[in-house]
Amino acid sequence: MAFDPLSLAYHEAGHAIVARHFGCELIDIFISLDDQCGGATVTVCGLNEWQKGLIALAGCAAEVLAGHAVADDPDRAWEYLKDANDAQQAVGEITGLDIGDDGFRNAYDALEAEAEELIRRPPIWSAIVALAAVLAERHAVDGATAMSIIDPILSGFADHSQGASAPQPELSGTA
């Protein structure tokens, strides 16, 4: 099964740009068109659970915003499930709630809405578009190349400098 390179590229670019926004060093980003991997973004940094959840949800959010989402494609369902599981783990760590507890879904939805809002910020979205274009063409980008593409775009973004020490918002699990 071959996947759409632009869809995969937006997905991985979403993860990479949000990770970079939080101060992560990008090591490698790649997409794979014909295996079950789909792609991966490899980073080095210390993150809090909130940031990990935002990064996990940013991939699908970027794909949807770009109009390339294939979330209902059973061949890619595992990829979305892994990201959702990572975000659920983050919500559990933040709130102390288990997936079936009252309020868990509200907290998850709040994290998801924040990821969607974050990638809509013009510098972040511009960086996602720029990196996705390169990824769709090359299928792999090393971290230094990726950062040389996106850092000039993000440098004008006021809160990009907050890095990995960004405060964690309160996700109480209630709406």
For each predicted feature, which ranges?
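Soluble catalytic regions of large protease machineries
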Residues: 2-175
